[in-house]
Design a protein with these regions (language model features):
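A broad, low-specificity signal for short, low-complexity segments enriched in glycine/proline
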Residues: 92-93, 129
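Alpha/beta catalytic cores of group-transfer enzymes, especially the acyltransferase/condensing modules
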Residues: 10-12, 39, 99-170
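Helix-rich "cap/lid" substructures immediately adjacent to catalytic or cofactor-binding pockets
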Residues: 2-86, 168
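Residues within well-formed alpha-helices
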Residues: 2, 34, 67-70, 93, ...
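Gly/Ala-rich beta-loop-alpha elbow adjacent to hydrolase catalytic centers
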Residues: 87, 91
Length: 172
């Protein structure tokens, strides 16, 4: 049997993520500490306590990468190794680290810049993204078109993640 590590993109983060791993596994603590050194701030404080910053792309992306690699290192320490890796969007960077195509510090630095550039591209309050789950694609497309026609902004399906899951962009 083959084992695949699949890494998610942004959106699954929550305050408190990784705290148990950090407290109970030295290998996870090491990953968080290494990320802190690259970032120049405490990613563990953001992951464990700061829901507001976790909602900001600039901080969420390094937090998710760090958490993903910490969890992977714990699994590896417990004898679970990946035969293959895959990632969605931001998760691709975790997959690169897991497959040893990129080292962790390089990925943290790159993802920090990625998050910063994405935040600068759409300043706070000027837009949002929503994961729409369980609705028919045509209905989502129609709703976006109606919202655009009736409003002062733009609403469009931005990413068709999977059947029944569409990421929509709203720009005001």
């Amino acid at each position: 049997m083959k084992t695949v590590f699949m890494f998610s993109g942004q959106g699954a983060q929550y305050a408190g993520m990784g705290k148990d791993l950090y407290k109970n596994y030295p290998v996870a603590k090491e990953i968080f500490d290494r990320a802190d050194n690259v970032l120049g701030y405490s990613i563990k404080d953001i992951c464990f306590e700061d829901e507001q910053k976790l909602g900001e792309t600039e901080f969420a992306q390094p937090a998710i990468l760090t958490m993903s690699i910490a969890a992977m290192k714990v699994l590896e320490e417990e004898g679970v190794r990946a035969d293959m890796t895959a990632g969605l969007s931001l998760g691709e960077y975790s997959a690169y680290v897991a497959s040893e195509a990129m080292d962790f510090e390089e990925a943290v630095a790159l993802v920090q810049k990625r998050g910063k550039f994405m935040a600068e591209a759409v300043p706070s309050g000027e837009g949002a993204m929503y994961a729409i789950i369980g609705l028919d694609t045509a209905l989502v497309e129609e709703a976006c078109a109606e919202a655009t026609a009736e409003g002062d902004g733009l609403a469009v399906p931005a990413n068709y993640n999977a059947p029944g899951q569409i990421l929509s962009l709203i720009h005001i």
